[in-house]
């Protein structure tokens, strides 16, 4: 079972629909509905942290879920969930250089993890005013996707993953109709097994 932590966001059920189309069994709980211990008792196979309107500090149980389950099962954070992953491992979440609400951007990626086999660059849809500050990214996380300036230098972080654990975040919305290959990205996450990355993950 895939457990979706709903950070009170209207996009959550679009994500649920996409995962359902990929034949995943999904259970949704609000971020203030269950404790970490109650979530553990549900014995999920994987957890997704949804988008939301706040910062990681107001995202209910999200940070505690990352701390408890990282290394035990696959975790994926989307938008706020991605920022929560960055913060949980020691990164800083700051205001983005440019607020993006319903705008598409081409992003570049390393063809790793959830980005494996996807178009590069990939057109994605962004709804966010916050980002993980790239200068603050902890040693244990690597940038897997980014936007670029005209000169090719890195602009904003669009994806991260833990270097040894099955923990990944994407700043954009794979469940948006305007995002290319959103189903394929989520299908890549569903293929991940266990908490520690091994061959084929």
From Swiss-Prot:
Reaction equation(s) it catalyzes: chorismate + L-glutamine = anthranilate + pyruvate + L-glutamate + H(+)
CDD domains the UniProt entry points to: GATase1_Anthranilate_Synthase
GO molecular function annotation: 4-amino-4-deoxychorismate synthase activity; anthranilate synthase activity
PANTHER family to which the protein is assigned, alphabetical: MULTIFUNCTIONAL TRYPTOPHAN BIOSYNTHESIS PROTEIN, MULTIFUNCTIONAL TRYPTOPHAN BIOSYNTHESIS PROTEIN-RELATED
SUPFAM superfamilies on file: Class I glutamine amidotransferase-like
Its job: Part of a heterotetrameric complex that catalyzes the two-step biosynthesis of anthranilate, an intermediate in the biosynthesis of L-tryptophan. In the first step, the glutamine-binding beta subunit (TrpG) of anthranilate synthase (AS) provides the glutamine amidotransferase activity which generates ammonia as a substrate that, along with chorismate, is used in the second step, catalyzed by the large alpha subunit of AS (TrpE) to produce anthranilate. In the absence of TrpG, TrpE can synthesize anthranilate directly from chorismate and high concentrations of ammonia.
Full protein name: Anthranilate synthase component 2
Domain Glutamine amidotransferase type-1 positions: 1-199
A biological process term (GO) from this entry: tetrahydrofolate biosynthetic process
Pfam family, one: GATase
Self-association and partners: Heterotetramer consisting of two non-identical subunits: a beta subunit (TrpG) and a large alpha subunit (TrpE).
Residue ranges crossing the lipid bilayer per the database entry: none
Induction per the UniProt record: Expression decreases as cell grow from early to late log phase and further decreases in stationary phase; there is about 5-fold less mRNA in stationary than early log phase.
Enzyme Commission numbers on file: 4.1.3.27
